[in-house]
Amino acid sequence: MSAALDAAQSAFGGPPSVVVNCAGIAPPKLVLGKKGVHPLDHFTKILMVNAGGSFNVCRLAAARMAAAPPLEGGEEKGERGVLINTASVAAFDGQIGQAAYSASKGAVVAMMLPMARELAASGIRVVTIAPGVFLTPMLEGLPQKVQDDLGKQVPFPSRLGRPSEYAALVQHIVENRMLNGEVIRLDGALRMPP
């Protein structure tokens, strides 16, 4: 991760002022499946990729932001940037077979406020987006009927979310300095069934 941040810093001529964590894995596994109990290493892997990966990026990016001078022309005195993490509605509405995924996204939600409070002294905000069902590469591989059925579960608009809608929220978070220490559900009022 340090190498990726080095590359970004070199390409953009300075440390990042906006970092978006938007990756994860979600392989389902029952706690008590037909093939036995849920392997602990499966649980640990999902937790480490989703929560550990988000934390790792945040800590490394925050160190670079904190060491940099405040943003020139920044609206707020001492502003250095924003870290935006991606959780999931599964953090709140976990489904059967998704104990590990829900726990990992719940951890992303849980670490956000302590990080926002700590990093505020350095002029760094932390915000988490909890998307519902979005047309991501993970879902694009599903048959169209499955995609349509997932979209119909969303009260309004009754469809899968679009990446452009996620991006629009990211842009708003960047521009609205009062958004700090918050989780924003982006789900069309979806509440996942068991």
Predicted feature locations:
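Conserved mid-core segment of classical short-chain dehydrogenase/reductases
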Residues: 26-44, 63, 67-77, 97-100, ...
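Catalytic Tyr-x(3-8)-Lys segment
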Residues: 48, 145-165
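Active-site helix of classical SDR
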Residues: 58, 104
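Alpha-helical segment proximal to the catalytic Tyr-Lys
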Residues: 63, 116-118
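Residue(s) in the substrate-gating loop at a strand-loop-helix junction
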Residues: 88
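Short, small/polar-rich loop/turn modules that mediate ligand/substrate recognition or access, typified
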Residues: 120, 125, 179-182
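C-terminal substrate-recognition "lid" of short-chain dehydrogenase/reductases
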Residues: 162-186, 191
